Amino acid sequence: MQSEQVRNIILVGFMASGKSSVARAISRRCHWPRIDGDEEIVARARKPIADIFRDSGEDVFRALERTVVSDICGEAGRIIAAGGGSFMDDENRQTMLDGGTVFYLSARPETIHYRVTRGNPNAPVRPLLGAGNPLQRIEELLQERMPVYSQAHHTVETDGLSPDQVAMAILKICGPGIPQYI
């Protein structure tokens, strides 16, 4: 029987912090459905996020993101991998904090840079990181976002850990609040 202690498990963090991979690992263990915020936005808009920004602008994207966050946090028993920037929005953040147990997946800038480039210094740079030094931009963005990320209910370090190890750490924090089929 599902405990009322944990309504949803919501994973937030910077790009490449492991949200989607960890959500899959948790879902396998507790048999709760995994919902990826970015995937849900793409499905509803029927186009990639970059195209939403290009065709309709950031305001339209953020409005759709708020609707998606509200909808996916509205039901219980879900593992939610939030979009990389969705927790930065005040309304989204409050919806997530009210809708489940929020875990900030923390990673060092060097780890994020490696994951984004897959260790290839010539890999294409994600738009958020812009031109210039991607590692420096990651450091700047993490520093800007830390006051917001610190509002999550829990912080879990992901450096040097596999998605399964991070999932187990999260499930340990949740305790008997969710079923586990390991």
Which residues does each PLM region occupy?
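Walker A/P-loop
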Residues: S20
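Walker A (P-loop) ATP-phosphate-binding motif of ABC ATPase nucleotide-binding domains
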Residues: N8
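Short glycine-rich anion-binding loops that position phosphate/pyrophosphate groups of nucleotides
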Residues: G84-S86, R108-E110, L161-S162
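Hydrophobic anchor at the beta1->P-loop junction of P-loop NTPases
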Residues: L11
